[in-house]
């Protein structure tokens, strides 16, 4: 799923940042955790790999009831979540929940980010 099988036998200096990140995600999931803490899980990934990771997180949440707490600055990655807390200056600025459409949720995220960025 994460495309890391071909990395078997490679040394750490032989893998890219994205390959290392996908390997770290696999390592975090190997023991079937009930909670997953993800700090910028798509930060070093291309858009295709980011989509694979976020769809995997959605799948394990739905099928295995794995709660994922994720920190991200990526609105597209955030749109895969069911609930988002926006933090500004160490305090909760806003909170939104996903309805039926991820695309609509993405637009809501962008709207909040526009407001958040305008409060200087």
Region spans (language model):
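A short, proline-enriched helix->beta-strand linker immediately N-terminal to the Walker B motif
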Residues: 30-34
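Conserved catalytic loops of ABC-family nucleotide-binding domains
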Residues: 56-70
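Conserved ABC ATPase "signature" region
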Residues: 1-7
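Conserved beta-strand-loop-alpha-helix hinge in the C-terminal portion
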Residues: 91-115
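Catalytic Walker B motif of ABC-type/P-loop ATPase nucleotide-binding domains
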Residues: 36-39
């Amino acid at each position: 799923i994460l495309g890391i099988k071909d990395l078997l036998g490679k040394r750490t200096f032989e893998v890219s940042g994205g390959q290392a990140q996908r390997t770290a995600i696999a390592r975090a999931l190997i023991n079937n955790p009930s909670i997953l803490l993800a700090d910028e899980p798509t930060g070093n990934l291309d858009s295709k790999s980011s989509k694979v990771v976020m769809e995997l997180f959605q799948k394990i949440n739905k099928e295995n009831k794995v709660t994922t707490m994720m920190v991200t600055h990526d609105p597209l990655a955030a749109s895969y979540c069911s609930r988002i807390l926006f933090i500004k200056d160490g305090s909760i600025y806003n909170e939104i929940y996903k309805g039926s459409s991820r695309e609509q949720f993405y637009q809501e995220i962008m709207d909040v980010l526009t407001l958040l960025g305008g409060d200087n």
